A protein has these predicted regions:
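AlphaC helix of the eukaryotic protein kinase fold
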Residues: 44-66
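Conserved short submotifs of the Hanks-type protein kinase catalytic core
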Residues: 82-96, 100
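Activation segment signature within eukaryotic-like protein kinase domains
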Residues: 115-116
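Protein kinase catalytic-loop region centered on the HRD/HxD motif
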Residues: 121-131
Length: 290
């Protein structure tokens, strides 16, 4: 465990402890170069000999280094400290969406749509870099005090440019696309499904499938119809159901083509317009409209 005032690579000084997960510890630190507070994520000492955990941490380090987007956590530096790999990234003043949900139960539709617009932008950028996040959920999304959304945790992200890497059933089963529950290769539509489940939770304060164990939840993703958001929040109309059901279609071919198409329907919800992708596509086919 790091201590207050420990120096990391003569660039960072530990100023506090922020928490820990299953794989890493997270500390607050000052950056001698930028003069700004940063977060230091360092793999736990006991996991340094665990190849799978090291690969996961290094995968996150590599992929984060190529990302530069206002809605993705920015990594400033990476390296090793006493044989333990670490990441130094921007310090977030705020909470995860999961913490927000636990504190306020759910977001208004307007608030949720503003969050979703940012998430669609960030995921579109990630996908254009040939990366599938694979772990989109409120716990991996920061809600800054200025309203900015930041996606974090690329530990199990799938690099489409490295197809030899074995696809595994990893991630949170509550947000897992049906095809991933079956061990299939991740795609853009897999992230879109997880984003749709996240949207469902933002506007209802509930998860669509809460079963007795992980296997039953996976079966629900595969076979059970998505419950209507109206059941949990009577103020929401059928258009919200339409958007979430399209994002979370059991067959990935029936989901949004990409996050920009998803974003257009989120914007239509925000503008209270009855002009959604499926309807636009019908007009295109019948009248040749754009």
């Amino acid at each position: 465990m790091l201590k207050i005032d420990d120096r990391i690579d003569n660039r960072h000084r530990i100023t506090g402890r922020l928490g820990q997960g299953g794989m890493a510890e997270v500390y607050e630190a000052s950056d001698f170069i930028s003069k700004k507070p940063v977060a230091i994520k360092i793999i736990k000492e006991q996991l340094c000999q665990d190849k799978n955990q090291l690969d996961r941490f290094n995968n996150e380090s590599k992929l984060c280094a190529i990302m530069s987007h206002p809605n993705i956590i920015k990594v400033y530096s990476r390296g090793e400290y006493e044989g333990r790999p670490y990441l130094a990234y921007e310090y977030m003043k705020g909470q995860t969406l999961n913490e927000c949900l636990r504190n306020s139960l759910m977001f208004s539709l307007k608030e949720a749509c503003y969050i979703m617009l940012q998430l669609c932008d960030a995921l579109y950028y990630i996908h254009n870099h040939n990366v599938i996040h694979r772990d989109i959920k409120p716990d991996n999304i920061f809600y800054n005090t200025n309203g900015t959304i930041k996606i974090a945790d690329f530990g199990i992200a799938y690099d489409l440019q490295n197809p030899s890497k074995k696809s595994e059933v990893v991630g949170s089963v509550y947000y897992m696309a049906p095809e991933l529950c079956k061990g299939e290769t991740p795609t853009i539509q897999s992230d879109i499904y997880s984003l749709g489940i996240t949207f469902f939770e933002l506007v209802t304060g509930q998860l669509p499938f809460v079963e007795k164990d992980a296997n039953e939840i996976a079966k629900a993703h595969l076979k059970k119809p998505l419950p209507s958001v109206h059941t949990f929040n009577p103020e929401l109309n059928k258009n919200v159901d339409y958007v979430i059901e399209k994002a979370c279609a059991k067959n990935k071919e029936n989901r949004y083509v990409d996050c920009m198409e998803f974003k257009k329907d989120i914007q239509a919800l925000l503008d209270n317009k009855d002009n959604f992708v499926q309807k636009r596509n019908i007009f295109k086919r019948v009248f040749g409209l754009k």
